[in-house]
């Protein structure tokens, strides 16, 4: 938990748990030179989200993520991708990194992995597992819990039978189109960012909290990401009719 707080650059969450572990450096997202400048002979891993969530819905560019992968290979550094929010089909791929032509050494996954059952996974590729961990190195009281693992199996069965990932890939362009139309129509919207069913609208000229409250009053649940982004992470089974209803309610909040 302390290490997780260390790599999450929010004073609000870090202050109650200081002193932290330390040894963490931060680079600018989608700026490869910024990442390279932080690398030393003591760098062991680069940790990042494939699509930033709390930071404001920023997808990594292909050039950036591929460049980070190349740096990790060049300097023998682990690439750890956080797919807790952007994974499990949300971007139209089972895992967001699959759209980038790279593969992480380590991946974290949770949230939708259990569809309500609390479970997380720390996934290593074969090379990393063979050279870093042996049984007993990382003990856990609840690791491999039968109930949680049964839930994960059921989730994957559901994904396969209902073609969840394919549905997201087919339906997301419609959502993106409708959101782009809102950006064109309303001056208070500066841009749309995101991938698949993980979308954000940049709100300008008015508090994003005001838009959120008005949306809730109209029966639409949305949340912020960063200080000025309206975040939308709808259910993966949402239909075009649902999207139309969502856009209608969102327009009422923007007017």
Feature-to-residue mapping (PLM):
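Conserved N-terminal phosphate-binding loop of PLP-dependent enzymes in the Aspartate aminotransferase
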Residues: 2-255
